[in-house]
Amino acid sequence: MDILVARTGDEIGQAFERLSQAQILGCDTETSGLSSRYGRLFSVQFSDGEFNVLVPVSEGVPLGQLAEVLTDASITKIFHNAKFDLDFLSENCYSVENIYDTMIAEKVLTRGANQSASLAETLYRYFAVDLDKSQRAKFNRKWDGIWTDELVDYALSDVIHLPRLMAEQMTWLDKLGLSEEFERQLGKILPANNANKNE
């Protein structure tokens, strides 16, 4: 796994050079809690499926040029439960264009099947990937802010799989004639200009 923890302007620039060339990017955040109003944004993660970047916002590192990747409408940003991440990004003055939500896609695909749409269970169903969520409990208001290798790996473990998951889901949405329903459901939680432009 090619990992960059981007702390300097040069590292942000290096990440931008590579990620700005992507057509799709997995994106995620780590936060201190569930409420963007009262919680803190600790990090923003990006992955093209091979190159994985974590920006440690908790250390005072701004996204810099990477904010342009979020607003670039030619790049699809893939989130799992986009509304959660978008709330925290918005609270920190970052906007995002062209969004795909793997959780909404999974809910559309599994409607009536009594299956969880959590990322851990979804990735296990598709790829037999077993996500270790044990590190998640460390991200709270009392966290010391130190990004250990284990925390970096945990934070990036979600985003690395999102590009491949989106491809699989889009294939199934198309095969089952559910693409329009997915767009309709996505539109319910996102402003119209943020929906996935690849459909």
Each model region followed by its residue ranges:
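An N-terminal structural lobe/cap that precedes and organizes the functional/catalytic core
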Residues: 30-49
